[in-house]
From Swiss-Prot:
Protein name listed in UniProt: UvrABC system protein C
Oligomeric and partner information: Interacts with UvrB in an incision complex.
Record field: transmembrane: none
Phylogenetic classification of the source organism: Bacteria, Pseudomonadati, Pseudomonadota, Alphaproteobacteria, Rhodospirillales
Compositional bias ranges of the Low complexity kind: 17-27
Protein family: Belongs to the UvrC family.
Start and end residues of each UVR domain: 230-265
GO biological process, one term: SOS response
Principal subcellular localisation of the protein: cytoplasm
């Protein structure tokens, strides 16, 4: 997973013994590397190239650190991009490991965390959704789960998207009638909910199904999610026939509907390969200086969907090197499957396979299919990669044209690389949030979005100008601190403010207070009756103006403003819902998440807890006599 030429072996040619007098023609970076070589060990490990600002430029791994790093002392033998990296290097740091496989895992984790500018980077770091069958209740529930997989949990996936999980969950509800409600809701029900009425839940909350029968349904769901769908369908068909022969047509109809739901979920998956088991299919395609990696997830022989990835800094590398770097970062977030099908082999096949085995806790095979059904899966993934990259290149071209048009419309020089759009959201000043949306040549840069919870107690509720002042001061004070030289990509080429002249002047004054007066600002005021298409634009030093109603730049700015509005409203709703969801139990010392869950599970609601007697509180698992007394006193201190 390094950018050194893979066909060039590590050399030990004495370059780690620098001359007593440094050659003045030697680049500074080479001198820094030679200085680091004096004390560098020959063990496996990870090295980091660091520039004068302390930023990590590159992370690499090696079986022998000294022999690997020696390669950098002769930059003329390396690609131009790596020569630039060496020239910027001021110091080096190393971390030793026991084995090269451990070094590979550490390298992947550091790249994912530090995002060095000269490494191939996996830009989409979103987690993948799973289906979880809970194990802490007599009647387990089946739910969508996203996040770090907890030890002891029972998870099925990953799925490529939330939509793929939702459709599978819907089919599972229809087929197995498992509950999805939270435990406190389950404990407080006195009659079946709507899901029982529409035949998506067996209503164990009100004893409409015996515990043994419900456990049988759970086992069937496990079997289906584990890939035993054919055996399950055969068993259901047999039971349907038996019920029909016994003239129990109502029960036969239930089995028929369950078979239909199972068939439906399988028919919605384009490709299924029952013999594949647990595997990911990975192919990639390069064009126009960009790379697309396509991943299909197969679990239990079923296609759980696919996702496209567009790694950064991959244009100068070949497909094998891109795939190798991708594997390390991609599987840093979740355990790899038992088999990974690849379009082409990678330079360090055995090493990567060994590292993935360490990460997974079981054997992982990297396979390059040459023929048969597995090769067809690779070809299908490659076709998807080509299509996805073609769409992205077309969108990037259109986006660059729009950014160029925006620069012309507002009298700005040069291409726009980063445009920031701001909007506020609140209800009568409560739970106010400012939202920052970022766009660039490749579209919306969602990883750069930021929300600002309005904190100042001096702001009058509903004062949009004061809210925007706070947002701007916080945003650009941080930029001045973290990127004073404006070379880390944190400074915008244009700032769009959702508001007219008053809002624009408030922003200008706020930025002037912190010494920022050279960021281009534009106010976007809605037209009469807030009509889209009649916006007026306010640029400092120019009279207000409008764009032609059919100008593509106008539509582009409307889209940016709508995205900022959507993001700000979503952030406001999240903040408001958190405030609404605060429980009276949260203010009781000693009551954490697990004890709160136990209390709600036992009593059904926070109100019931507050009304409970001391003896009842002591009966709850995990609540000691002393804590029960503290809890009781908290709710009865005035009575």
């Amino acid at each position: 997973m390094t950018d050194l030429p893979v066909d060039e072996p590590d050399r030990d040619d004495g370059a780690d013994q620098p001359d007593a007098g440094a050659d003045p023609a030697t680049p500074r970076g080479v001198e820094a590397i030679r200085a680091a070589l004096r004390t560098m060990p020959s063990s496996p490990g990870v090295y980091r190239m660091i520039d004068g600002k302390g930023d990590v430029l590159y992370v690499g791994k090696a079986r022998n650190l000294k022999r690997r790093v020696i390669n950098y002392t002769q930059p003329h033998r390396l690609p131009v991009r790596i020569q630039r990296m060496i020239a910027a290097t001021l110091t080096m740091e190393v971390l030793t490991t026991h084995t090269e496989a451990e070094a590979l895992l550490l390298e992947s984790n550091l790249i994912k965390k530090l995002k060095p500018r000269y490494n191939i980077l996996l830009r989409d770091d979103k987690s993948f959704p799973y289906i979880e069958i809970t194990s802490d209740h007599a009647f387990p529930r089946i739910v969508k789960f996203r996040g770090t997989l907890r030890k002891g949990g029972e998870y099925f996936g990953p799925f490529a998207s939330a939509g793929a999980v939702t459709s599978t969950l819907t089919a599972l509800q229809k087929t197995f009638l498992l509950r999805t409600c939270a435990d406190n809701v389950f404990a407080s029900r006195s009659r079946p909910c709507l899901l029982f009425q529409i035949k998506r839940c067996a209503a164990p909350c009100v004893d409409r199904v015996a515990e043994a029968d419900y456990k049988a349904l759970v086992e069937e769901a496990r079997a289906f999610l584990s890939g035993s769908s054919k055996a399950l369908q055969h068993d259901l068909a047999k039971r349907m026939d038996e019920a029909a022969q016994a003239l129990d047509y109502e029960q036969a109809a239930i089995f028929r509907d369950r078979i239909k739901a199972l068939t439906n979920v399988q028919s919605h998956q384009d490709i299924n390969l029952p013999t594949l088991g647990e595997a990911d299919v990975i192919a990639c395609h390069q064009a126009g200086g960009q790379t697309c990696v396509q991943v299909f997830f197969f679990r239990g022989g079923r296609n759980n969907g696919n996702r496209s990835f567009f790694p950064a800094h991959a244009g100068d590398e070949g497909l094998p090197e891109v795939l190798e770097a991708f594997l390390g970062q991609f599987y840093a977030g979740f355990p790899p499957p038992r088999e990974i099908l690849l379009l082409t082999d990678i330079p360090h096949h055995d090493l990567v396979e060994q590292a993935l085995c360490l990460r997974a806790g079981h054997r992982v095979r990297l396979v390059v299919p040459r023929r048969g059904s597995r090769r067809k899966l690779i070809d299908h993934a490659l076709a998807n990669a080509r299509e996805a990259l073609g769409r992205r290149l077309a969108e990037s071209s259109a986006q660059r044209t729009l950014l160029e048009g925006t620069a012309v419309a507002f009298g700005l020089d040069g291409p726009l690389q980063r445009v920031e759009i701001y909007d506020n959201s609140h209800i009568s000043g409560t739970h106010a949030v400012g939202g920052m949306v970022v766009a660039g040549p490749e579209g919306f840069m969602k990883a750069a979005y930021r929300k600002f919870n309005i904190r100042s107690p001096d702001i009058t509720p509903g004062d949009d100008y004061a809210m925007m002042r706070e947002v701007m001061i916080r945003r650009f004070a941080r930029a001045r601190k973290e990127d004073p030289d404006r070379d880390r990509g944190q400074w915008p080429d244009l700032v769009l403010i959702d508001g007219g002249l008053g809002q624009l002047n408030a922003v200008r004054e706020a930025l002037a207070e912190i010494g920022v007066e050279d960021v281009p600002l534009v106010g976007v005021a809605k037209g009469p009756d807030r009509d889209a298409g009649r916006e007026r634009f306010f640029v400092p030093g120019r009279p207000p103006f409008m764009l032609r109603h059919n100008d593509p730049v106008l539509y582009f700015i409307q889209r940016l403003r709508d995205e900022a509005h959507r993001f700000a409203i979503g952030s406001h709703r999240t903040r408001r819902s958190k405030a609404i969801g605060v429980s009276p139990l949260d203010s009781v010392p000693g009551i954490g998440a697990s004890r709160k869950k136990a209390l709600l599970h036992h009593f059904g609601s926070a109100k019931a807890v507050s009304q409970a007697g001391l003896t009842d509180l002591e009966a709850v698992e995990g609540i000691s006599a002393a804590l029960a007394k503290k809890l009781y006193d908290h709710f009865h201190s005035e009575g």
